[in-house]
Amino acid sequence: YIFLSISLLLLFYIFYKAQIVHGGLESVYYLKYYYFSFSLIILSLFSFKLSKEIKFMISTVIIASTFSLYIAEIVLLKINNYEDTAIKKFALKKNPNFDLRSQYEAYMDFKRIDENYVNPVLPKHFIYDYNVKLYPLSGIPNKPVVSCNENGYFATYNNDRFGFNNPDNQWDIKTIDYVLLGDSATHGDCVNEPDTIGGKLRSYNNVNSLLNLAQAGNDQLIEYATLKEYMPTGKIKNVLILYHENNDLPGLSLSLKHPILKKYFDDENFSQKLKNKVTELKKIKEESMSKRTERGKKQQDDLDWIKANKKIYERRKLITLIRNTIVFTRIRTELIEGNRFEKAEEDVFKEFEEILMKYKKFLKAKDINFYFVYLPDIRRYIDNEKK
């Protein structure tokens, strides 16, 4: 009965995380955990038919394995807490004026200056929403955006008429020198627009026009869909894809599972005609932003409560630590999720090559130069130094 009770508690906890904490926004992500908990329930029911000797052996193995896992979990939690504290101390030492506001606090402060400010709405926010009628490939158009903080300040930029990080007049130029596609590094996450890759390239005298169609979290399929939906009508000289080896392929694995995005892969003529559906898209994007802002408010309310109730918080912190330890938070992050990314790379490499060939065919037919820029991850060199 103990095994069955634990299995049921696990199921309820997964439901709580998926539907209450995340508001159902990431239900697809939690499917594997639902399958796991149901499997445990079935096994626990089956165990009632086993003999006492076999039950004892199984229980011994489970208890020993669980004990070992908890030791590993505690060690990983200690290491993670140390790293977080060290990073914060280093940031403050390098920049005493490092902005320590939360994303929600910064957003609300910017809203007091200009009520038009919005939070980022990104294509990846819809990757687990299989019921969305239109799949957005950009942010909320014609709005100033409060970006993230990695350098001690909250970066801002203005979305153009289609929701991309560009000066809006770039769309009116008849001949486009460069179109950029990529993820956060190309999008310009956490830096102001003049400091983005697109902003730097525009500063060169020989670059007359450039459109940055990148969005944080994008992968090759989303980028391919973006190019097909938002291809400028005038002449384009060059298209550059900036590929980041650390996370683009795992992202592609998720995109290939989405029913709308998969159509771009299967059908070269498929289009959502997003340029003509600005009103419908705006509603979908604003609803998504509203949900995420509400989640940010809840997190901020929790932080404010912590500041006002430090003694009670210390008890709650202990409870949270125990809860995270019970569900193997760090082990899942370090091992299960890490292996998922490695497996994803193997599973989708063929599709990745096919998408590149689709790019080549699509752009060659329009007499556009195609460049693939490979951005290596820093861990490649750190790992080599360790070896």
Question: Which stretches of residues belong to each language-model region?
Answer:
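Membrane-interfacial loop-to-transmembrane alpha-helix junctions, especially the N-terminal start
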Residues: Y1-S7, I54-S59
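Membrane-embedded alpha-helical segments of integral membrane proteins
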Residues: I2-S47
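Extended hydrophobic/aromatic segments used for targeting, binding, or gating
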Residues: A64, R202-S203, L211-A216, L221, ...
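Serine-dependent acyl-ester chemistry module
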Residues: L4-H22, H244-K387
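Conserved SGNH/GDSL esterase-like catalytic core that processes O-acyl groups on lipids
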Residues: Y178, H187-F270
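Membrane/wall-proximal cationic-aromatic binding patches
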Residues: N81-Y204, R332-L335
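Internal/C-terminal transmembrane anchor helices
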Residues: K52-K78
